């Protein structure tokens, strides 16, 4: 928004890596007391690391009370709405004033392919500009189609074609199956890791990201072990997984989006990580 870092207030998260709603309320009220004007709250529908989903319904009530705009960053998690099994996790997303969607994430399309959805289409009028050389007023009145009003850069690529073709090919049921499969695989992987005393899982996945770490009984240097295992997975086994930090500890981050992934492959991966971790532990 071009307001500078000083205008952005970071809100703490709870133990499940979701926005702390009580902290949000307190920060908004403090801003008002300090003479500031809080006008926008951003909920995350699928955080980058943990895939956590903020409670949009409660945030909406707060935003209505203080006349704030509610935006949902659903770049990662927007596809959950198409899963018949898991769509309830996005309860209240319809209450948002605007939503960000990245079709190049859960929808598996080539980058870049993103969209901003707004509840009130007239919101885009803020982008409207008229000039003799650009989007003349009389042209608009005569019904000419012009993409000037559709983006800040006054034009855009035909990325919508990717979305249209994929939905024509797969349909709602096809996407529901793909997204549900990825989320169910994440639940399975989480459960298997939770039952394995060699691993600590940071939080229960809400979408398809599982964040975990190997726990060593022989050394306190588990951070280096997890880093080493990640490198070995890449260079020796062709397995690419992410890395992040939680509570000061290095963790591995596995985001499942491939609908062809099976439980057997996930079991093999868990066993491989455990084997490599124990080898690193000895060295």
Language model features: what each stretch is:
Residues 1-122:
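Conserved PLP-enzyme active-site core in the AAT-like
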Residues 15-16, 46-48, 77, 104-106, ...:
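Short, glycine-/Ser/Thr-/acidic-enriched flexible segments
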Residues 26, 54-61, 65, 188, ...:
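Alpha-helical scaffolding segments of alpha/beta enzyme cores, especially the outer helices
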Residues 63, 193-194, 233-234:
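A generic structural signal for well-ordered alpha-helical segments
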Residues 66, 91-197:
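Active-site C-terminal subdomain of aminotransferase-like
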Residues 200-205, 241-246:
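Short beta-strand
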Residues 201-233:
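Conserved PLP-binding catalytic core of the aspartate aminotransferase-like
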Residues 246-283:
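PLP-dependent enzyme catalytic core of the Aspartate aminotransferase-like
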């Amino acid at each position: 928004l071009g307001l500078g870092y000083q205008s952005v207030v970071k809100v703490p998260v709870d133990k499940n890596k979701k926005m702390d709603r009580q902290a949000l309320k307190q920060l908004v009220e403090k801003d008002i007391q300090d003479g500031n004007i809080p006008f926008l709250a951003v909920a995350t529908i699928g955080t980058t690391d943990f895939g956590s989903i903020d409670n949009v319904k409660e945030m909406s009530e707060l935003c209505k009370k203080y006349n704030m705009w509610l935006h949902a960053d659903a770049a990662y998690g927007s596809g959950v709405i198409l899963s018949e099994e898991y769509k309830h996790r996005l309860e209240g997303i319809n209450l948002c004033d605007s939503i960000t969607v990245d079709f190049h994430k859960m929808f598996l399309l080539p980058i870049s392919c993103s969209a901003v959805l707004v509840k009130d289409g007239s919101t885009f009028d803020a982008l409207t500009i008229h000039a003799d050389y650009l989007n003349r007023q009389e042209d608009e009145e005569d019904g000419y189609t012009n993409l000037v009003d559709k983006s800040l850069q006054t034009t855009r690529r035909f990325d919508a074609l990717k979305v249209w073709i994929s939905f024509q090919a797969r349909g709602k049921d096809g996407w529901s199956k793909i997204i549900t499969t990825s989320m169910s695989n994440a639940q399975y992987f989480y459960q298997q890791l939770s039952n394995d005393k060699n691993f600590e899982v940071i939080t229960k996945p809400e979408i398809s990201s599982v964040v975990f770490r190997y726990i060593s009984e022989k050394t306190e240097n588990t951070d280096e072990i997890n880093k080493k295992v990640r490198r070995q997975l890449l260079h020796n086994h062709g397995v690419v997984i992410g890395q992040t930090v939680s509570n000061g500890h290095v963790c591995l981050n596995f985001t499942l989006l491939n609908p062809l992934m099976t439980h057997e492959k996930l079991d093999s991966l868990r066993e491989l990580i455990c084997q490599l971790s124990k080898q690193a532990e000895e060295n």
